[in-house]
């Protein structure tokens, strides 16, 4: 994973875990890699993964069972709520960017309605829209 130098690494790992849950890469109830294994995979210190896991647990998206491991929550309602919030933020940023270019809300709506859809390969489309 490439990291953005302007954002703490643990925050980027939290976002990756959230996105993997939202796009189904990590299934409900699935066991996450151990802190040590995830640190090796992500090429970071174990303390960074530990913090990311703890923050994910605080967000309610994973649960840790002492001596067993960390697991994706099985609360579909919460996952749906997080997905809706993610979509809202993407749309809000999209509108903000177009307004910064001088488009009105009505013009933005017309652009969305009249822009031909871009076809992405299925495997890429889920990843691109959850970043």
How should these model regions be labeled?
Residues 1-31, 37, 85, 89, ...:
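Extreme N-terminal segment that seeds HTH/winged-HTH DNA-binding domains in transcriptional regulators
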């Amino acid at each position: 994973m490439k990291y953005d130098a302007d954002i703490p690494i643990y925050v980027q790992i939290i976002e990756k875990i959230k996105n993997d849950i939202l796009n189904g890469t990590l299934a409900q109830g699935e066991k996450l890699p151990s802190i040590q294994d995830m640190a090796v995979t992500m090429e970071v210190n174990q303390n960074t993964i530990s913090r990311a896991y703890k923050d994910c647990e605080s967000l309610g998206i994973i649960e840790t069972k002492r001596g067993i491991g960390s697991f994706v929550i099985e609360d579909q309602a919460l996952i749906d709520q997080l997905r809706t919030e993610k979509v809202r933020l993407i749309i809000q940023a999209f509108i903000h960017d177009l307004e910064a270019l001088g488009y009105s809300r009505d013009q933005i709506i017309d652009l969305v309605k009249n822009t031909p859809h871009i076809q992405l390969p299925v495997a890429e489309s889920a990843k691109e829209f959850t970043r």
